[in-house]
């Protein structure tokens, strides 16, 4: 294997970030994991964020309805697009590549999904969701996400962001810290979702 190749370097980035002992990385990966049964998956997490903004900003019923409809369409279209591309490209997951070429003992911080790696559904839908919220609230709105505040299995303390862009970037990078996506995938997926 060519250790100077782009793919090898991407895999090493996943490996290094996954093994980093900094609890911040682990907390981010777990906070944005959004497994079923906790926040209703990534889409559910973004709907709870939207609801927090609706309440905080005092949106009227018609304004809230517009946000929820646009958000629902955007995240569903994002996931449809992402999964079409996943099976078009059928790209290998970091865990598979790392096991095969670097470290057969490697394990991810969060569960590695049983479908192709590229693009990242979380990043794709995060980009789409935050673009919708920006169209209603502007990007510079600060947000404190308390979606996971009552969870005891992870550090669910509310997370505060100075902008929606900052939040979407954290959602995206959390997948690298979880060990389930390559950095290049995250960057491309977030950019696609924003379009």
Language-model segments: what does each one mean?
Residues 1-195:
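Acidic/polar surface patches and capping/hinge elements
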């Amino acid at each position: 294997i060519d250790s100077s190749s782009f793919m090898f370097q991407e895999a090493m980035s996943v490996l290094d970030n996954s093994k980093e002992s900094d609890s911040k990385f682990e907390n981010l990966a777990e906070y944005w994991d959004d497994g079923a049964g906790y926040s209703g998956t990534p889409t559910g997490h973004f709907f709870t964020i939207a609801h927090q903004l609706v309440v905080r900003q005092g949106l009227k019923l018609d304004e809230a309805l517009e946000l929820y409809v646009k958000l629902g369409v955007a995240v569903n279209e994002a996931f449809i697009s992402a999964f079409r591309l996943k099976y078009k490209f059928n790209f290998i997951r970091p865990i598979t590549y790392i096991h095969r070429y670097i470290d057969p003992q490697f394990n991810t911080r969060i569960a590695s999904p049983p479908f192709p790696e590229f693009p990242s559904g979380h990043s794709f839908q995060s980009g789409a969701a935050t673009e919708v919220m920006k169209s209603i609230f502007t990007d510079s709105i600060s947000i404190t996400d308390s979606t996971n505040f009552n969870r005891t299995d992870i550090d669910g303390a509310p997370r505060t962001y100075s902008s929606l862009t900052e939040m979407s970037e954290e959602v995206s990078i959390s997948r690298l810290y979880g060990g389930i996506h390559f950095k290049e995938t995250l960057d491309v997926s977030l950019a696609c979702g924003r379009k």
